[in-house]
C-alpha cells in the first residue's frame, strides 16, 4: 500500500466510517455568486453534532459516500463537493439547526429542475444520522437561472392576451369535481363565464375518466367559453387539464386545445413531474398557450415544518420549470397558508428581485434576471366576504378563484359569478379611492350588496362561514 493511500485511509475515519465534517464542513468558505445555496432545517439524531449533521447533508447531496473510494483520486473533490459553510440554531426549537450548504454550479445539468432536485433533495432525506430534514430555501444564481425558459409568457403578456388590466382576475373551479358528463360540465362553465368570471377551471383530478373523456370535455368547454365571449364582449378562458399518464398523451391534449383556439391549458406539476411540466411549458410558449399550474400533492411534501420541502422552494422550481399561474394558498380560506410566509413566496413568484427577509421566511436574496413572473392563484374555501382581504393581500397581479363560493350561490352559477364580480369591482374601486380595505372591507361589501341582489344573497349565505384552525407552518 502506498504512503498516499495510507494517509487517505488513516485520517478522519473510524471503523470504516467517514466523519463528514472533516471534509464537508467548511466554516471559512465564502460562497461564490455562481453557487447554488440551500438552507436546510436539520434535526440530528441524539449524539450527532450539528456540524456533522450539516456536513453529512452537504456530502450526501453532492459527492460524498460513507467511506473512501479509490476513484476519489481521479477527480477534484475540492472543486465539486458541496460545503456546509454555516450552522445556526432554530430559535425556540430544541435540537434543530439551519445548515447552509453551497453547491458548485457544475454539479447540475443546465435547464433541468429534475436533475437539481435529484441531487439536493434526493437520498439525503433518508439519511440515518438525521431524525428529520427540511429544505427551507434555495438561492438560484443568475448563471443557472439563464439556462431555463421559465414561464411560457408571464404576467404582462397574459394581461395583453386577455385585455384585462387594473384588477385581480376571477376564476372558479367546476364542482362536483368528478361525476359530471361533458355536456353538463360545459353548461356549468358557460353559466360561470357569462356571469362575469374571467376563468373557469378543471379540478386537478379531472383527466380522462369513463364518465367524461378529455376530448368531449375540451369540446364542450370550448363551446361554452366562445359563447360567453360573444355575450359579454370579454375574453374568457377555461383551464383545460392536459395532465395525462404519459408526456406524449399530455402534449397531444395540449395540441388539441390549441387547435380549438382556447387561450389556456393546465398541468398538475408535482404529480405530473418536472420533466413533463418543462416540456409542456416549452410547447405552450411556442404555440401561444397560457399554462395554469396546480400544486396537487404539495402538502405531502411541505406541510410538516421539520421535514420535507417548503413550498417557497417548490414555487421557485416552478418558476424555473415554467407556468403562468400557480396555486399559492389564500391566508384566509380553508387551506394552509400563514400570511407573512405566503406573501414571501408570492413575491418570489412575481418579482424580478427579492431581498433576503427572514421575517417572511426568505433566507437568500434572489435575483430572477429576465425570467417572467408567475401569477399566484388564491383558492380554497373563499367567498365574497373574503374579497376585501384577498384584494389587499394579493393585489392586482393575482387570480382569485372561488369554487364553492360561486357554485354554492342559492340562485345558481351565473348569479354566483355576478356576486363575485360585483364584490371585486367594489373593492378595487374603494382601494383606488384610497380606502382601507382591511378596516372598511365589510362595509364596502354591504354597500355594494344594496344594489346587487346577487351579492346580497351571497352575503347572507356565507356570513357565518369561517375556517379557523391553527397554522401548521409558522416562522
UniProtKB/Swiss-Prot annotation:
Pfam families referenced in this protein's UniProt entry, alphabetically: RuBisCO_large, RuBisCO_large_N
PTM annotation (N6-carboxylysine): residues: 201
Binding positions for substrate per the UniProt entry: 123, 173, 177, 295, 327, 379
N-acetylproline PTM sites in chain numbering: 3
Primary location recorded for the protein, binned into one broad class: plastid
Cofactor note as given: Binds 1 Mg(2+) ion per subunit.
Active site: 175 (proton acceptor), 294 (proton acceptor)
Catalytic activity: 2 (2R)-3-phosphoglycerate + 2 H(+) = D-ribulose 1,5-bisphosphate + CO2 + H2O; D-ribulose 1,5-bisphosphate + O2 = 2-phosphoglycolate + (2R)-3-phosphoglycerate + 2 H(+)
InterPro entries: RuBisCO, RuBisCo_large_chain_AS, RuBisCO_lsu_C, RuBisCO_lsu_C_sf, RuBisCO_lsu_fd_N, RuBisCO_lsu_N_sf, RuBisCO_lsuI
Propeptide residues, chain positions: 1-2
Enzyme nomenclature, EC number: 4.1.1.39
GO molecular function, one term: ribulose-bisphosphate carboxylase activity
Role according to the record: RuBisCO catalyzes two reactions: the carboxylation of D-ribulose 1,5-bisphosphate, the primary event in carbon dioxide fixation, as well as the oxidative fragmentation of the pentose substrate in the photorespiration process. Both reactions occur simultaneously and in competition at the same active site.
Assembly information from the UniProt record: Heterohexadecamer of 8 large chains and 8 small chains; disulfide-linked. The disulfide link is formed within the large subunit homodimers.
Other remarks on this protein: The basic functional RuBisCO is composed of a large chain homodimer in a 'head-to-tail' conformation. In form I RuBisCO this homodimer is arranged in a barrel-like tetramer with the small subunits forming a tetrameric 'cap' on each end of the 'barrel'.
Protein name stated in the entry: Ribulose bisphosphate carboxylase large chain
Protein species of origin: Fagopyrum esculentum subsp. ancestrale (Wild buckwheat)
Amino acid at each position: 500500500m502506498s504512503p498516499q493511500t495510507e494517509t487517505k485511509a488513516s485520517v478522519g475515519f473510524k471503523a470504516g466510517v467517514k466523519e463528514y465534517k472533516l471534509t464537508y464542513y467548511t466554516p471559512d468558505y465564502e460562497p461564490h455568486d455562481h453557487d447554488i445555496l440551500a438552507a436546510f432545517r436539520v434535526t440530528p439524531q441524539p449524539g450527532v453534532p450539528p456540524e456533522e449533521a450539516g456536513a453529512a447533508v452537504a456530502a450526501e447531496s453532492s459527492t460524498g459516500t460513507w467511506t473512501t473510494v479509490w476513484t476519489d483520486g481521479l477527480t477534484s473533490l475540492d472543486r465539486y463537493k458541496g460545503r456546509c459553510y454555516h450552522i445556526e440554531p432554530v430559535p425556540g426549537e430544541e435540537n434543530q439547526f439551519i445548515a447552509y450548504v453551497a453547491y458548485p454550479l457544475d454539479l447540475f445539468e443546465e435547464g433541468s429542475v429534475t436533475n437539481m432536485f435529484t441531487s439536493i433533495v434526493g437520498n439525503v432525506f433518508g439519511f440515518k444520522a438525521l431524525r428529520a430534514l427540511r429544505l427551507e430555501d434555495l438561492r438560484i444564481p443568475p448563471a443557472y437561472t439563464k439556462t431555463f425558459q421559465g414561464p411560457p409568457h408571464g404576467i404582462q403578456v397574459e394581461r395583453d392576451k386577455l385585455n384585462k388590466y387594473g384588477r385581480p382576475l376571477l376564476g372558479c373551479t367546476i364542482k362536483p369535481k368528478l361525476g359530471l358528463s361533458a355536456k353538463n360540465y360545459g353548461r356549468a362553465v358557460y353559466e360561470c363565464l357569462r356571469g362575469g368570471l374571467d376563468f373557469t377551471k378543471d379540478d386537478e383530478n379531472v383527466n380522462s375518466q369513463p364518465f367524461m373523456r378529455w376530448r368531449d370535455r375540451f369540446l364542450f368547454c370550448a363551446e361554452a367559453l366562445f359563447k360567453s365571449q360573444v355575450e359579454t364582449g370579454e375574453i374568457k378562458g377555461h383551464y383545460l387539464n392536459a395532465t395525462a399518464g404519459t408526456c406524449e398523451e399530455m402534449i397531444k391534449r395540449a395540441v388539441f386545445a390549441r387547435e380549438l383556439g382556447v387561450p389556456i391549458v393546465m398541468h398538475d406539476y408535482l404529480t405530473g413531474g418536472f420533466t413533463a411540466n418543462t416540456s409542456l411549458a416549452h410547447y405552450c410558449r411556442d404555440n401561444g398557450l397560457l399554462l395554469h399550474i396546480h400544486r396537487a400533492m404539495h402538502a405531502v411534501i411541505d406541510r410538516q415544518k421539520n421535514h420535507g420541502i417548503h413550498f417557497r422552494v417548490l414555487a421557485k422550481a416552478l418558476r424555473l420549470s415554467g407556468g403562468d399561474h400557480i396555486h399559492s394558498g389564500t391566508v384566509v380560506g380553508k387551506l394552509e397558508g400563514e400570511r407573512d410566509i405566503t406573501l414571501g413566496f408570492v413575491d418570489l413568484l412575481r418579482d424580478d428581485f427579492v431581498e433576503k427577509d427572514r421575517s417572511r421566511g426568505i433566507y437568500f436574496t434572489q435575483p430572477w434576471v429576465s425570467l417572467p413572473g408567475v401569477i399566484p392563484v388564491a383558492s380554497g374555501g373563499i367567498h365574497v366576504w373574503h374579497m376585501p382581504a384577498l384584494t389587499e393581500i394579493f393585489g392586482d397581479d393575482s387570480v382569485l378563484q372561488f369554487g364553492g363560493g360561486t357554485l354554492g350561490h342559492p340562485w345558481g352559477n351565473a348569479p354566483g359569478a355576478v356576486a363575485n364580480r360585483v364584490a371585486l369591482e367594489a373593492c378595487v374601486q374603494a382601494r383606488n379611492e384610497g380606502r382601507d380595505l382591511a378596516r372598511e372591507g365589510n362595509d364596502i361589501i354591504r354597500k355594494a350588496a344594496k344594489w346587487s341582489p346577487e351579492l346580497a344573497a351571497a352575503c347572507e349565505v356565507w356570513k357565518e362561514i369561517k375556517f379557523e384552525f391553527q397554522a401548521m407552518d409558522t416562522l
